[in-house]
Amino acid sequence: MCTGFSFFTQQQHHYLARTMDFTFEFNGVPTAVPRNFEYQFDLEPSMKLTYGFVGTNLKVGRYRFGDGINECGVAISNHYFTGEASYSKHKRYGYFNMAPEEFIIWVLGFTKSIQDLKHKVKKVNIMNEKNETLNIVPPLHFIITDREGHTVSVEPHNGLLIVKDNHVKVLTNAPKLEWHVENLRNYAFLSPEKSTNQLVGKVLVRSMGCEAGTNGLPGGYTSTERFVRTTYLRHHLPQSHDESVNLMNCFKVLDAVSIPQGAVVDAGETHYTQYQLVMDSKDRAYYIKPYFTNQIFKIQLNEQLLTKKDMTFIDVNHQLTITQLN
């Protein structure tokens, strides 16, 4: 059901990383949307988007994005929030009314920073609109970061959006962020350092090696376990002057919470990580790694993409690449 985190480096690169976990095959296509693109919202007149962006276009209706980064460095991903997300049953006068999945397009198309978001989101109303392809009203919440390094979570309550400063810089699924943060108290003993040997009576009990400090780190795929595991790994990531190392470390954390096919089954269908993604707010770069490939693909949000007349759909190789050495 998706894991996300942000990570900031000494060179002022601000990353937002996520897994896209789902049962329904999205067959997502990386798509660049130019600035001033005319977008038809479901519940409002068509509008020109102020900013261009790149994200993965999910095949669950007309232009639905699960994540993206815009030309100002604002990056966002959505995550299921089952049992917690609540939407409005009626339009609100004077508000921008939209379907749950359209919030990402609104954020990327109209906001330039977290501060800008906090101001504009006060007049957004999320409606209880069903996605006809999925046959549900998607229960969503969001993690967002910007070029200044701020990270927030956004939760819908009766259609209105609550913006929360996310100091842990991790988001999974239900329950609410505050519950996850409080739950971290149960894991305060975790450490990258090995535990010390202890004398019990006359018996010297030796530590179980250099990994002993991680004994008790949750290993399952529930929302609560993934939150703890991601928080621990993200918090202890080393800083490198080589930005390619920082980028790869983000993908390594995603590996630790990615769900392989067969590990989780929902109603007879496999629920797995369909792709991993890291977005760089400083360079406006979008790095994606689909499940069936070992390659990372980069899309640079440049002026060529931003000044086109229409969307650009970008093909990604989904095959395994092996380099033979003899």
Say what each PLM segment does.
Residues 71-72, 108-116, 239-247, 282:
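A short, structured loop/turn motif at beta-sheet edges
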Residues 22-24, 82-84, 159-161, 292-296:
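Short, surface-exposed beta-strand-loop junctions and turns on beta-sheet-rich folds
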Residues 14, 75, 149-152, 160-161, ...:
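Hydrophobic residues embedded in beta-strands of well-ordered beta-sheets
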Residues 123-161:
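Catalytic cofactor-binding cores of redox enzymes
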Residues 1-15, 129-131, 137-138, 147, ...:
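C-terminus-biased signal that marks the final domain/tail of proteins
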Residues 1-95, 128, 326:
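A contiguous strand-loop segment
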Residues 25-27, 85-87, 152-155, 162-166, ...:
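Short helix/loop capping segments that flank catalytic or ligand/cofactor-binding pockets
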Residues 30-48, 85-125, 307-320:
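Compact, glycine/acidic-enriched structural inserts
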